[in-house]
Amino acid sequence: GSEDADIIKNDSYRDKIKNKRYYAGAKGIGRFSCDRLGKRLILTTKTSDSETCEQINVNWSKFEEDQHNEFVNINVDYSQIPYNLEVFPDKSTHGTILDIKPLNSTWDREKLKGLKHSLEKLINPVSNTDDFSIEIICEREFEEDRSVDKFDNPKYIDRDRINGVIKNSILDILNLKTTQIDVQITKDEILTTVIDRGDNIYKIREINRKYPLLDDVKISLFYLNRTAKVNFTRRMGIEPVNYGSIFLFKNGFRVYPFGNKGDDSWGLDYRAQQGHSRFLGTRDLFGKVEINTNNNFQFKEVSSRDGGLVE
């Protein structure tokens, strides 16, 4: 359609951005994809010790006028604006705001619900840190959210509300209903714990001789028996197979496409097909692999947001 045509049309300047390898964290600036959402971007940012806010105003149409013009040669509007307590939420003295407008498409309730469901998968369900939270605020949906709360119907669940802080409560649902294997890998040792419906079965502590590059890895795997699948579907409003399988997080952020519906980046389904009753596939397992590392060279993500890690 026309949207796909626009994407193809604009690929050239996006590719130039990616190839420059200007990283925002472990990603290129193309990761933000603001131009796909709207026609303009107003970025406002301030440090805690600054007295003013820095602001840039980007008109994406300027990048499309001449595909041969390098993006570094295209001017964007820059200004400094006075700071006041109303600039950032909760009267914060620092922060960054990305204001995208006008939007390229209409965001109705169903689209916002899909956004919420996608964002909850970005939240590491077993992270012990509170570095940040994601909250959706959409005033026009307040009344409908209140109506959803009044329904005494299992069809309407917490995930159907648009407004509020996004949480990933998957592991709370599964914790006491199935068999779980937890693995912690440090530079010196590997600690494996088997838990069955909340009870510790056994622990194994081994010397880490095989994985010198892994010094802070946590793995949680859950076996999806029938009870776990039924409970998951009832609480989440979606079957586990359609939600995803084993997700990968690097330094607290999710790495795509690991865990996506139909994705076999872990090779589970391939191995399961090699023999009967010998291996578990993505339909049978749910969980996460969490890697914390400063070694971005060995665990570098590809420039595409859904390309996984560089092999």
State where each predicted segment sits.
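Short intrinsically disordered coil segments
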Residues: 73-78, 112-120, 151-153, 263-264, ...
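Charged regulatory segments coupled to nucleotide-binding catalytic modules in large multidomain enzymes
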Residues: 194-311
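Catalytic micro-motifs at enzyme active sites that drive phosphoryl/nucleotidyl and oxygen chemistry
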Residues: 21-22, 29-31, 81-88, 123, ...
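Conserved, well-folded catalytic cores of nucleic-acid-processing
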Residues: 2-3, 40, 44, 122-125, ...
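Glycine/threonine-rich ATP-lid/beta-loop region of ATP-binding domains
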Residues: 86-238
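Short, well-ordered loop/turn elements at secondary-structure boundaries
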Residues: 28, 36-39, 92-94, 129-130, ...
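A short, sequence-level motif marking secondary-structure junctions
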Residues: 58-66, 151-161, 260-264
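GHKL (Bergerat-fold) ATPase N-terminal catalytic module, capturing the glycine-rich phosphate-binding loop
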Residues: 1-102, 108-109
